[in-house]
């Protein structure tokens, strides 16, 4: 059985790890970095760039450089959070035919899972390069507060990338695995505060140890899937734009190029202010008007940044209270607080969390790598390489169906340990009703329409009977990935209908298969491109070396041969500008054929040079022999 790799598919950065013996190891990508920016760029010449190369060209290609795609995955276009992003993102977010939020890239409609798959492919390639063998299976992490649609979309992204997703696990739970695996014996209750690039989670987790087996049980989880470092960046960007407008009277929001430069500068300034008290945002030639070029130079202090984002940090505190309440615990019951996600490096975040829990958070967990390490550990558990570890996760939101009067009736409450199965008997609302519609919902609101609709299906063929008489058993079954399977059965007729919730929209099987085929075709075209580049390099080398040999041969090369070679060189040069590998190879072959006389001359010259150097060596050797002989004689006399 091959390795199951662990992937932290992050909003801002992604990370991949594997189990190396009993230790989890984070792998470095082709650029030598342990994390990869979750950025994908589609260039003008049709190339797809992922990670650092995509980030580097973002300034010159803002509309086709996609970042923070995780904020859109599994979401509807009309969602309030998506509408917020529509107005601030430099790329184009559109409504798909099924109502989902998709993207328009150079006139082509693309689904978020399709784009996230590019990042997963890079993670897969990183692992394959390290292991030297194909990788087909992965454990991928998601925010604990992701709903069913978002989890399903993440699984779809894995499939498009050519990975069988063996398990979807929650990010805070993965971080707890990374933290707890090598810690002291004994029972502990920990709080994992995970503030990443685009999402926020809090999980209360109990680690129990019985006879050497560690059980990681999630007691409660809460969060906000649209709160993260990107929002902190946006606050700082808006402040800088407003300051520049006050100073210069120019609104940079209408200039995508300037906004992309500003985004990079704001992110850099935010990071610097975690260790420094103030920083300069200095962007020369940010824009220009009739009077000439304009430069931005604005001082930002840590206090200013904190005043801009204080409400965002406070927004993360309310879910902490709810999670503790749901777990039936108080602050004093928490033994350790773990911070995960890059945004937790901000001193203000650390201070607020320490104030809430009454203790300093642990500093021995790497906030960027813990989640991927935990995913790799879970991969090890699934392959049997890691023993004596049991993971008990929970479903983050209640699941139920719509009943008479538009009410949400829960079948599975939030924070129920998964996998789980629950059945409940319902009946008809009207006399002689022959069919019922099962409308599946996820959320905590009483009114059905206020919750997330996951899908609906009909159960037909109910025998005519007075209202309230038929017995329809609805069963909810959540698997270990937190994905829901629903069935409805008429107990009288035995008729049954089943559905695996694919979200009310999401990608259907046909779309996923098409994207998988596209990804495979891209892999094939990437391979062909690589071969073309290699052939081009060989052609360039042949061009250069032949020209050099013609020069060295001088008058020794007959005029006819020289003309034929010059013609073949010119033909090869033209072929090298094209995209046809076979044409380049053919012209290289032609050049080799007409260059036979040239090769002979080159070999003769080479032989003469060698003979000349051999004579010189022989003469030197004679002189050396005399010295050696004298030296030898001296030695003998001793």
Swiss-Prot record:
Q: Which SUPFAM superfamilies match?
A: Actin-like ATPase domain (SSF53067), Heat shock protein 70kD (HSP70), C-terminal subdomain (SSF100934), Heat shock protein 70kD (HSP70), peptide-binding domain (SSF100920)
Q: Which residues carry this modification: Phosphothreonine?
A: 199
Does the record bear ATP-binding in its keywords? Answer: yes
Q: Which domain of life is it from?
A: Bacteria
Quote the protein name from its UniProt record.
Chaperone protein DnaK
Give the protein family: Belongs to the heat shock protein 70 family.
Q: Which Pfam families match?
A: HSP70
What are the start and end residues of every segment in region (Disordered)?
Answer: 603-638
Induction of expression? By stress conditions e.g. heat shock.
Q: Which Gene3D superfamilies match?
A: 1.20.1270.10, 3.30.420.40, Actin, Chain A, domain 4, Substrate Binding Domain Of DNAk, Chain A, domain 1
In its UniProt entry, the species of origin is given as Salmonella arizonae (strain ATCC BAA-731 / CDC346-86 / RSK2980)
Described function: Acts as a chaperone.
Q: Which GO terms describe its molecular function?
A: ATP binding; ATP-dependent protein folding chaperone; unfolded protein binding
Which keywords are on file for this protein? ATP-binding, Chaperone, Nucleotide-binding, Phosphoprotein, Stress response
């Amino acid at each position: 059985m091959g390795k199951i790799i662990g992937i932290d598919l992050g909003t801002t950065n992604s990370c991949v790890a594997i189990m190396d013996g009993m230790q989890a190891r984070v792998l470095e990508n082709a650029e030598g970095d342990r994390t990869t920016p979750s950025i994908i760029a589609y260039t003008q010449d049709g190339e797809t760039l992922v990670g650092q190369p995509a980030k580097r060209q973002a300034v010159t290609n803002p509309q086709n450089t996609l970042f923070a795609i995780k904020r859109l995955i599994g979401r509807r276009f009309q969602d309030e959070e998506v509408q917020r992003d529509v107005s601030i993102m430099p790329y184009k977010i559109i409504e798909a035919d099924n109502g989902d939020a998709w993207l328009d890239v150079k006139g082509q409609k693309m689904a978020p899972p399709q784009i996230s798959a590019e990042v997963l492919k890079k993670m897969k390639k990183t692992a394959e390069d390290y292991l030297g063998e194909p990788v087909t299976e992965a454990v991928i992490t998601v925010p604990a507060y992701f709903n069913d649609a978002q989890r399903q979309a993440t699984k779809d992204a894995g499939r498009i990338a050519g990975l069988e997703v063996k398990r979807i696990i929650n990010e805070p739970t993965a971080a707890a695995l990374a933290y707890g695996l090598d810690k002291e014996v004994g029972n502990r209750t920990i709080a994992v505060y995970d503030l990443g690039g685009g999402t926020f989670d809090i999980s209360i987790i109990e680690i129990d140890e019985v006879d050497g087996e560690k059980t990681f049980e999630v007691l409660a989880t809460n969060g906000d899937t649209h709160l993260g470092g990107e929002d902190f960046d946006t606050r700082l960007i808006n402040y800088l734009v407003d300051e520049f407008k006050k100073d210069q009277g120019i609104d940079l929001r209408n200039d995508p190029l300037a906004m992309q430069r500003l985004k990079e500068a704001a992110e850099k300034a935010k990071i610097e202010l975690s260790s420094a008290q103030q920083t300069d945002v200095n962007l020369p030639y940010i824009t220009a008007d009739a009077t000439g070029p304009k430069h931005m130079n604005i001082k930002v202090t840590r206090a200013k940044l904190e005043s801009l984002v204080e409400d965002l940090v406070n927004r993360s505190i309310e879910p902490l209270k709810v999670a503790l309440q749901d777990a039936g615990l108080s602050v004093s019951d928490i033994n350790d607080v773990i911070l995960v996600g890059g945004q937790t490096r901000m001193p203000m975040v650390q201070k607020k969390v320490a104030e809430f829990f009454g203790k300093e958070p642990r500093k021995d967990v790497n906030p960027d790598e813990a989640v991927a390490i935990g995913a790799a550990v879970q991969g090890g558990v699934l392959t049997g390489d890691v023993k004596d570890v049991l993971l008990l996760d929970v479903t983050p939101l209640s699941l139920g169906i719509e009943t008479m009067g538009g009410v949400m009736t829960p079948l599975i409450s939030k924070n129920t340990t998964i996998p789980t199965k629950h059945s409940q008997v319902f009946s008809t609302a009207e006399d002689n009703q022959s069919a019922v519609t099962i409308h599946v919902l996820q959320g905590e609101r009483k009114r059905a329409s206020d919750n997330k609709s996951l899908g609906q299906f009909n159960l037909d063929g109910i025998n005519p009977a007075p209202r309230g008489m038929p017995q329809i058993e609805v069963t909810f079954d959540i698997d270990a990935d937190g994905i829901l399977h629903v069935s409805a059965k008429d107990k009288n007729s035995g008729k049954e209908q089943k559905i695996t919730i694919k979200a009310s929209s999401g990608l259907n099987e046909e779309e996923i298969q098409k994207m998988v085929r596209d990804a495979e075709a891209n892999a094939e075209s990437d391979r062909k491109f690589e071969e073309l580049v290699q052939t081009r390099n060989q052609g360039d080398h042949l061009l250069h070396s032949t020209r050099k040999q013609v020069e060295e041969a001088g008058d020794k090369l007959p005029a006819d041969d020289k003309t034929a070679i010059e013609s073949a060189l010119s033909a090869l040069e033209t072929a090298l500008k094209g995209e046809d590998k076979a044409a380049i190879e053919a012209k290289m072959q032609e050049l080799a054929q007409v260059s036979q006389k040239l090769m002979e001359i080159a070999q003769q010259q080479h032989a003469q040079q060698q003979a000349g150097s051999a004579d010189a060596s022989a003469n030197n050797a004679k002189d050396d022999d005399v010295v050696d002989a004298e030296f030898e004689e001296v030695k003998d006399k001793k």
